[in-house]
């Protein structure tokens, strides 16, 4: 009986650009009006060189606890250490963000409406196939977070409920 699985994806970005958003602060000021302000912004970043991604980690709820999730996670590093020639030098871990009751990204639902027709695609499905349309269609300059819907603002950088244990484990290892 299989109760858990973890995965490693190699050469991500080898056949096309991978994209992600980075949240940061943008400071603005005016000597004339004598003010300084710090704004929350997100900016699209493209990764063109291949990298290895720590992928799926799933453990059946009946078997969670007692370090089993950590074992599944760390097994990936052991595997990479045994066969380093199979993996890229850069290793990335992506944590899935918050989703609604229909399993759609809350952030993407609110952000993408400025650039795409909602009926155009199911974003999760098409982005796993090829997300280059994102880097082709979205401007490269920073976007203010404040115009986004409040629910979208609150969940930027917050992991999906099912990913919280993995997120905490990675943060503790950093």
Regions found by a protein language model. Name each.
Residues 72-75, 85-126:
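Glycine- and acidic-residue-rich phosphate-binding/metal-coordinating active-site segment common to enzymes
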Residues 35-60, 136-156:
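Alpha-helix-centered segments that form part of catalytic cores
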Residues 2-4:
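Glycine-rich acetyl-CoA-binding "A-motif" of GNAT/NAT acetyltransferases
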Residues 37-39, 56-59, 64-80:
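Conserved acetyl-CoA-binding loop-helix of GNAT-fold acetyltransferases
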Residues 47-57, 80-96, 106, 153-157:
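Conserved GNAT acetyl-CoA-binding A-motif
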Residues 7:
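Short hydrophobic beta-strand segments that form the core of ligand-binding sensory/regulatory domains
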Residues 119-174:
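Long, charge-rich C-terminal accessory regions
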Residues 10-56, 115, 120-128:
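Conserved acyl-donor/pantetheine-binding loop and adjacent beta-alpha core of acyl/acetyltransferases
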